[in-house]
């Protein structure tokens, strides 16, 4: 998002210095609360939000089940029934990721514990492994590639999702340039 939004921001506010700091959501929260970080962009559920922080929702994003197309055919998996994948390997995001709480809940609701091949912080790695017919995965819709015929995507029951938000400390003054950056980020996700 940042690399797409920043050039537009720089054209509007050329004299404003932005210091991007890449941190996990869990690391951003204390930095926002302490004032070390003015503005954060993150993905989380409402239950993961912390008091003392304002969250402006930029977009909501649904999770999808991603399965190698060859496996979909072999299992005659027309409706994306997650239970059919009980014995299949999954690559999941690391337990410290905000998405992992959602993913664990999806498996709990499906009535089984997944066979975890490995965990990663990189969703592109999950997509690569699925593309190579090594595993299945649950990902944000952002990572769907309808052009990739090696992967079939399914919506999940209850349509689990998270929010993409701009976050800042309650009572913290949001400057006009910061507001511009938030608006540009919101536009990015609604295009």
Show where each model-derived region lies.
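Beta-alpha-beta core module
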Residues: 48-56, 60-61, 124-171
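Short secondary-structure boundary/capping segments
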Residues: 10, 54-57, 73, 81-83, ...
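Central regulatory/effector-binding core of bacterial HTH transcription factors
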Residues: 1-47, 119-120
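Alpha-to-beta junction loops
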Residues: 33-42, 63, 112, 130-137
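Flexible hinge/capping segments at coil-to-helix
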Residues: 52-90
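Short hydrophobic/charged patches on amphipathic alpha-helices used for structural packing
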Residues: 29, 33, 55, 82, ...
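Thr-Gly-centered strand-to-loop micro-motif
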Residues: 93-94, 114, 139-140
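A late-sequence structural motif
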Residues: 1, 152-191
């Amino acid at each position: 998002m940042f690399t797409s939004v920043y050039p537009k921001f720089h054209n509007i506010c050329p004299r404003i210095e932005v210091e991007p700091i890449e941190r996990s959501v869990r690391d951003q929260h204390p930095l926002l609360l302490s004032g070390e970080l003015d503005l954060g962009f993150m993905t989380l559920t409402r239950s993961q939000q912390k008091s003392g922080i304002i969250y402006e929702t930029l977009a909501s994003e649904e999770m999808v089940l991603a399965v190698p197309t060859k496996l979909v055919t072999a299992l005659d998996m027309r409706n994306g029934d997650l239970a059919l994948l009980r014995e299949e390997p999954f690559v999941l995001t690391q337990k410290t990721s905000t998405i992992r709480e959602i993913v664990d809940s999806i498996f709990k609701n499906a009535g089984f514990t997944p066979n975890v091949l490995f965990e990663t912080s990189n969703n592109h790695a999950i997509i690569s492994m699925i593309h190579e017919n090594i595993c299945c995965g649950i990902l944000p819709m952002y990572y769907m590639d309808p052009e990739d015929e090696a992967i079939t995507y399914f919506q999940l029951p209850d349509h689990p999702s998270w929010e993409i938000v701009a976050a800042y400390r309650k009572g913290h003054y949001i400057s006009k340039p910061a507001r511009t950056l938030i608006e540009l980020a919101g536009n990015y996700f609604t295009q």
